[in-house]
Amino acid sequence: MKLLALGLSIVSVALAASRKSAPKGAFTVGKGQKFETISKAVAALSNTTTAEQLIFIQPGTYAEQVFIPKLSGPLTVQGYTTDDSKYSKNQVTIVASESQKTQPGNDLTATLRVWTSDFKLYNVNVRNAFGEGSQAVAVSANAGVSPLRVFSLLT
């Protein structure tokens, strides 16, 4: 029984890992990187490959509205974090300020618009900073979205 408890504690520690560097083959976003905005990394994705694609985002606040179009394969977006089990440790935020005062529908107000299936988002805070007075959403998902894990939505 002690071995089982020790094994479980090792697994839980391993699951609460940091994500400080981009996995091999990832599109990396951040100052001094090939892509300085998330939207530019998304634009560089292949919409014909069925292989998994990955975007890794360095720490920072990214003031942009991000649209993920329909892709042929899975996409994972991973933000920099020192502890991937706590959203309070996330160091990446995407923020925009659209609302139905400026856009004709909910989808167009979203800070993150996802139109592809098999999409995963890890350790990224998504915020619509419009405020009060009109409908404004943080995330709009128009396809089969897989896990959105350890993140916060702020409107």
Regions found by a protein language model. Name each.
Residues 134-155:
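Eukaryote-skewed repeat-based solenoidal scaffolds used as protein-protein interaction platforms
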Residues 31, 72-135:
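Right-handed parallel beta-helix/beta-spiral solenoid domain characteristic of secreted/periplasmic
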Residues 26, 52-54, 65, 74, ...:
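Detector for repetitive beta-architecture
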Residues 32-43, 49-76, 80-85:
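N-terminal extracellular ligand-recognition/capping segment immediately after the signal peptide
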Residues 13-40:
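Right-handed parallel beta-helix/beta-solenoid
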Residues 1-19:
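Fungal secretory targeting signals
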